[in-house]
Design a protein with these regions (language model features):
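Conserved small-domain helix->loop->beta segment predominantly found in fold-type I
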Residues: 284, 289, 293-338, 346-362, ...
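PLP-dependent enzyme catalytic core of the Aspartate aminotransferase-like
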Residues: 294, 298, 359-435
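N-terminal glycine-rich, Lys/His-bearing helix-loop that initiates the first secondary-structure elements
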Residues: 1-82, 197, 419-435
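Conserved PLP-enzyme active-site core in the AAT-like
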Residues: 75-78, 82-309, 327, 370-371
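Glycine-enriched alpha-helix->loop->beta-strand junction motifs that scaffold or abut catalytic
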Residues: 229-231, 344-345, 364-366
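A common structural junction motif
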Residues: 343-347, 394
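Short acidic (Asp/Glu) and glycine-rich catalytic loops that position anionic groups and cofactors
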Residues: 19-25, 52-53, 62-63, 176, ...
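Short, conserved charged micro-motifs
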Residues: 257, 330-337, 376-381
Length: 435
């Protein structure tokens, strides 16, 4: 057998092994991952031909297709327009761009478009160690790709949130073109309403990165940033909003100021950063959103009561799907995440607000997300069982390899994906009966 054939066989075997490992044998607590329903998986199989097609073109100020540059687009255009209209109805806005392929791409287009319109290269954001996504930071997309000057908001470590008074002073002094809220470590709603007036006073646009909490927003279980004053919401479609990998941008076209910005963002999407639109990746309900938050809060309470330093105890630990846990006492984030991985409990190491943001390799904390286990049907009592398994690993009471068998056994009890439809037919029947 030649080397090419060996590599191909290894590739196929690794794909099968991954499916068994992560889908059947692990409990996934990565906060940035989601779980697709059977109906969504069926929809992806239904539209396989879309993956082979190009559909570049311009959109209008409602986010619908304006002009195509390729032929054979009549049904692709219907699909894109329907998807855009569904997004606008779900989030109660009058403009969206669904062509971006990730949350980071949504940030790229929004930051680029607005900075071009304002001719202002300054952006004020939360510090990286306090939860900001790498794409907001001077070390990431905003600084290294777009060349923006990054200025940090003030952060209250006790409240685990942005300090409104000090941040208002920073915004007034900096006079940026962009102020970005939202985060990658995102436990509590950010002060959108509280900062809106000062952002307007300096002529800036307020962007809210809702990648982690989009499904919670859709389900009414978190803040509603557009209603609170955000000019743009950027997001990904595969975290608490449990669809395939993708991105979107939301806004309301209300005046000439917003029209200029939307046109700038659309230009940054196409032609600046997108050629083809990957429609094959396009897709939460209220019950799912609320149960996800309840599960996260239950885990926070249980772990805290058993001696683990869970951040945010005075505020109920979290109002999102996430928990932040200080594990320095047990060897730090890198060690604990690795130990839990050996037990088939998948989490990630994470900087905490008081960490040196250059210490990403071994931060103080780990981040947990409960959207995946909630989708599988975990309730509060199941979460406590899971926490017991985590505690036995974190505190070194049992070897991870021993705990692994219990984790696999627990995972096998939850084989049905909840809060969704089992087929396209079931979804269509439900919608027909509801109307």
């Amino acid at each position: 057998m030649d080397e090419f054939a060996k590599l191909f066989i290894e590739l196929v075997e690794a794909c099968h092994a991954h499916e068994r490992y992560r889908d059947l044998e692990c409990i996934n607590l990565i906060a940035s991952e989601g779980l697709k329903s059977p109906a969504v998986r069926e929809m992806l199989r239904l539209c396989m031909d879309l993956e082979s097609r190009y559909s570049e073109g311009e959109n209008d100020l409602q986010g619908r297709v304006k002009e195509r540059y390729y032929q054979g687009q009549k049904y692709i255009t219907v699909i894109e327009n329907c998807a855009a209209d569904l997004v606008k109805k779900l989030f109660n806005c009058n403009w969206t761009d669904i062509r971006v392929v990730s949350g980071t791409h949504a940030n790229l287009a929004t930051f680029k478009g607005i900075s071009n319109v304002t001719k202002n290269r300054k952006m004020v954001v939360a510090p990286l160690s306090c939860g900001a996504h790498i794409s907001h930071d001077y070390t990431g997309l905003a600084g290294q790709v777009l060349g923006l000057e990054i200025i940090n908001l003030a952060y209250d470590v006790e409240e685990l949130n942005i300090d409104v008074d000090k941040s208002s002073e920073i915004i007034r002094a900096a006079r940026p073109g962009l102020v970005t809220l939202g985060a990658s470590l995102f436990l509590f709603p950010h002060p959108v309403k509280e900062l809106k007036s000062v952002v307007e006073d300096v002529g800036a646009y307020l962007v809210y990165d809702g990648a982690h909490v989009l499904g919670l927003i859709a389900g009414g279980a978190f803040q509603d940033p557009l209603r609170e004053g955000a000019d743009f919401v950027t997001a990904s479609t595969h975290k608490t909003f449990p669809g395939p990998q993708g991105g979107l941008i939301l806004a309301n076209l209300t005046d000439e100021r917003m029209e200029k910005a939307i046109k700038g963002v659309q230009h940054a999407v196409f032609p600046l950063s997108t050629s083809n639109v990957h429609l094959a990746r396009l897709p939460a309900g209220e019950d799912l959103a609320k149960q996800t938050v309840r599960n996260a809060q239950a885990a926070g309470q249980y772990l805290y009561e058993h001696g683990i330093k869970v951040l945010g105890e005075k505020k109920g630990f979290t109002r999102s799907h996430q928990l932040a846990i200080d594990v320095r006492e047990y060897g730090g984030g890198k060690k604990v995440a690795k130990d839990l991985e050996e037990a088939n409990i998948i989490v990630n190491k994470n900087l905490l607000p008081y960490d040196d943001q250059n210490n990403r390799e071994n931060p103080s904390g780990i981040r947990l997300g409960f959207q995946d286990v909630t989708r599988r049907g975990f309730r509060e009592s199941d979460i406590e069982h899971l926490c017991d398994l985590m505690l036995s690993v974190i505190k070194g009471k049992r070897k991870p390899a021993e705990v692994r068998e219990d984790v696999i056994a627990l995972r096998k009890q939850f084989n049905t994906i909840k809060y969704g439809f089992n087929s396209i037919e079931e979804a269509m029947k439900y919608l027909e009966e509801a109307n």
